[in-house]
């Protein structure tokens, strides 16, 4: 999954407003000095997420590429991933030493999944603001992603969410698959996600 076999491809999915772009930004800033990193963002009709990452200086602009998927965003990460595979190939041409590519999906529902041809690892982001019941509703993003990120844990008291219930439901729905609570704006929970990526992505620890 590392250089010999091409870069490690990490899919980041989740509903609109859950924190996908913030997670992508935090991961890029944490990893960019240790690894060669690039990002592909998916939006339906714009390149807004790519622009956000560029403005936040998550990476240099030539390492950020936005693709406009049109229609349903899940099609570009699952049924027909060609637009993303072409973007990854272009990033490989630009940066032959590329080690990590993040593929951020457009906002989608709990049924969104990444094609195994596109992503080696998948991170799925939900927000406590969506409701305490989200983990137990299931769906492939909840049950089959490699790591489930439950974001905006700091807002739980304000939206009347019991994090203990969410934790129990997530554990029950995911079995042995890992998950974690995050407050991405403050960076809480990010180190644990990075540890997971390095350990499970075949990366050399640096």
Curated annotation (Swiss-Prot):
UniProt xrefs under Pfam families: cobW
A GO CC term attached to the entry: cytoplasm
PANTHER family cross-referenced by the UniProt entry: UREASE ACCESSORY PROTEIN G
HAMAP family, per the entry: UreG
Keyword Cytoplasm: yes
Family of this protein: Belongs to the SIMIBI class G3E GTPase family. UreG subfamily.
Gene designation: ureG
Alphabetized InterPro entries for the sequence: CobW/HypB/UreG_nucleotide-bd, P-loop_NTPase, UreG
Keyword annotations from UniProtKB, A to Z: Chaperone, Cytoplasm, GTP-binding, Nickel insertion, Nucleotide-binding
Subcellular location, record wording: Cytoplasm
GO BP, one annotated term: urea catabolic process
Cross-referenced NCBIfam families: ureG
Task of the protein: Facilitates the functional incorporation of the urease nickel metallocenter. This process requires GTP hydrolysis, probably effectuated by UreG.
Protein name: Urease accessory protein UreG
